[in-house]
Each structure stands twice: as structure tokens, then as C-alpha cells.
Amino acid sequence: MASPKSSTRPNQENQEPQFQDFFPTMAGKLGGEGLIEEICKGFELLMDKDKGVITFESLRRNASTVLGLGDLTDDDVRYMINEGDFDRDGALNQMEFCVLMFRLSPELMEASRCVVTEVIEEEFYRH
């Protein structure tokens, strides 16, 4: 998972948490499927076991105990949930979490864009 640099508190300049991006290294070592498996394991660590989604409460609790991010404010936690909550149900399902993790990694997003472009070009030129 993306890892906080020194704090996840928004900085004054852009008001977004800053993260150190370990995904490209993980992808290189684990491969695509291995990376997805690790992201899914991260989801399981943070989710509410009864509801099967990451809720405000489960993220607040598990970010502190599992990830050691005890200095997160309620606003930090809300921001993290809202950033990936596409269906606006107030929680992150596994797909939303995986998409969010990829969105937080500019290098992986660029690599994905290149792969999609190659596939489209191959299909276009084959027909």
C-alpha cells in the first residue's frame, strides 16, 4: 500500500495527504497478480469484518492499530474514505479500495495507461 511520508495530515499548499509510493517497487517484485493480492490483503486488514467494507470506524481503528497511524484526525479519515467512495455510500468496498490505491500511485497509473494504449493500437491495426 502507499505509505505516508511523515504524516498523512494535509499540507498547507494543496490540502491533500502526501504518500510515499511503494507500488512500483512492489509491482516489480510481485508482478501484477501479486500486487493485487497484496492490495486485497490490505483491504481485509482495514475493513469492518461484519460489514465487509472499510467504514469510517474500521479505518479509524485499524489505521491506528494495524498501520500505526494514530495521529489521524477524524477529518483525515473522512478525506480518505471520501477520496475513494465512488458510490457515495460512506464506505469503501474492495473494488473502490483497489482503484483508490492505484490512483494514489502516479507511476502505476502511467504504466497502466501505456498498456491500455498498446492494446488499443494492436486491436486497431489488426482490423
Curated annotation (Swiss-Prot):
Residues 72-107 form the EF-hand domain. SUPFAM superfamilies: EF-hand. Induction: By auxin. Residues 1-20 are annotated as: Disordered. GO terms for molecular function: calcium ion binding. Ca(2+) binds at D85, D87, D89, E96. PANTHER family: CALCIUM-BINDING PROTEIN KIC, CALCIUM-BINDING PROTEIN PBP1. Interacts with PID. This is Calcium-binding protein PBP1.
